[in-house]
From Swiss-Prot:
Keyword tRNA-binding attached: no
Record GO cellular component, one term: plasma membrane
InterPro entries, sorted: HtpX_protease, Pept_M48_protease_HtpX, Peptidase_M48
A Pfam family per the record: Peptidase_M48
Cofactor binding remark: Binds 1 zinc ion per subunit.
Name by which UniProt lists this protein: Protease HtpX homolog
Record's keyword terms, sorted: Cell inner membrane, Cell membrane, Hydrolase, Membrane, Metal-binding, Metalloprotease, Protease, Transmembrane, Transmembrane helix, Zinc
Enzyme Commission (EC) number: 3.4.24.-
Compartments it resides in: Cell inner membrane
Disulfide bonds listed in the record: none
Record's bilayer topology term: Multi-pass membrane protein
Species per Swiss-Prot/TrEMBL record: Cereibacter sphaeroides (strain ATCC 17029 / ATH 2.4.9) (Rhodobacter sphaeroides)
Transmembrane segments: 7-24, 29-46, 145-165, 174-194
Superkingdom assignment: Bacteria
Length: 300
């Protein structure tokens, strides 16, 4: 089912990409956009996870350097009944995390240095479980493809500023100044709306399943509250440079969108916390974090 959703998404984003190309360069622009889109579809399926990790400067965690963290992730993956994903660390003080990969067998979880410093081991377990839920649900390919295409559509729309008003070799003049300006605004907005629809619909489900994986909904609820508060005060420079990836994070890392609920990439954090607290009232509780002592590990 995950591949079906991803195929539909690729078709929608490809159509949007072709539309932008046609508006910029008429028939020739559409043909060029089609060729680019075909290449992007292949690239995003096989390599988009590595591209996103590279955008954020993530480096793979050595199990010997952070055994407690590594064992925590492995224990949660075992509890979720899925393969152990690769584990990456992002060197930023903002607490946050995301998952990526085309399927559970080829997946990665990336956490920030700020997350490991600001949260308790229990809260980190809640966050990791949320990301594992995205992987198990096969949301990660969907979100990574969206991020790649949204960024490309935004760049293509910006090209319209330079080429949109000029005539092509057939004498066509697809866009004037007004059309160019409209395209620069509307194309990224359309891509962003697709991102928002996907992220909002999947976050609640990942919260629910993540809480089941770690066995303590309140661990994740507490983590979300801390991350939300700190993310609004601490910069994530690489996320600001790559806003198309914002919907992949557990909490929106962008300051500019933090209070804009109309165009938010995530559901309201207070509502997510309330849902987890309601879940905790009737849920059986796990007694400990999988395979890790109840202390701060050597990952600070």
């Amino acid at each position: 089912m995950g591949y079906v959703r991803t195929g539909i998404l690729m078709a929608v984003m490809t159509a949007l990409f072709l539309g932008v190309g046609a508006l910029i360069g008429g028939q020739s622009g559409a043909i060029i956009a089609l060729v680019i889109a075909a290449g992007m579809n292949l690239f995003t399926f096989w390599n988009s996870d590595r591209a996103v990790l590279s955008m954020h400067g993530a480096h793979e965690v050595d199990p010997r350097a952070a055994p407690d963290l590594y064992n925590m992730v492995r224990g949660l993956a075992d509890r979720a009944g899925m393969p152990m994903p690769k584990l990456y660390l992002i060197e930023t003080d903002q607490p946050n995390a995301f998952a990526t990969g085309r399927n559970p067998e080829n997946a990665a979880v990336a956490v920030t240095r700020g997350l490991l410093r600001a949260l308790t081991p229990e809260e980190v377990a809640g966050v990791v479980a949320h990301e594992l839920a995205h992987i198990r649900n096969r949301d990660t390919l969907l979100m990574t493809v969206t991020a790649t295409f949204a960024g490309a559509i935004s760049m293509l729309a910006n090209f319209a500023f330079f080429f949109g008003g000029s005539s092509n070799e057939e004498g066509e003049r697809p866009m004037g100044l007004v059309g160019t300006l409209a395209l620069m605004f509307l194309a990224p907005l359309a891509a962003g709306l697709v991102q928002m629809a996907i992220s909002r619909s999947r976050e609640y489900e990942a919260d629910r399943i993540g809480a089941e994986i770690c066995g303590r909904p309140l661990w994740l609820a507490s983590a979300l509250g801390k991350i939300e508060g700190l993310a609004q005060r601490i910069d994530n420079v690489r996320a600001e440079r790559n806003p198309a990836t914002a919907h992949m994070f557990i909490v929106n890392p962008l300051h500019a969108m933090g209070h804009d609920r109309l165009f938010a990439t995530h559901p309201n954090t207070a509502n997510r916390i309330a849902a987890l607290r309601a879940m905790a009232e009737g849920a059986p509780q796990a007694s400990r974090i999988p395979r890790v002592a109840a202390r701060r590990g050597p990952w600070n």
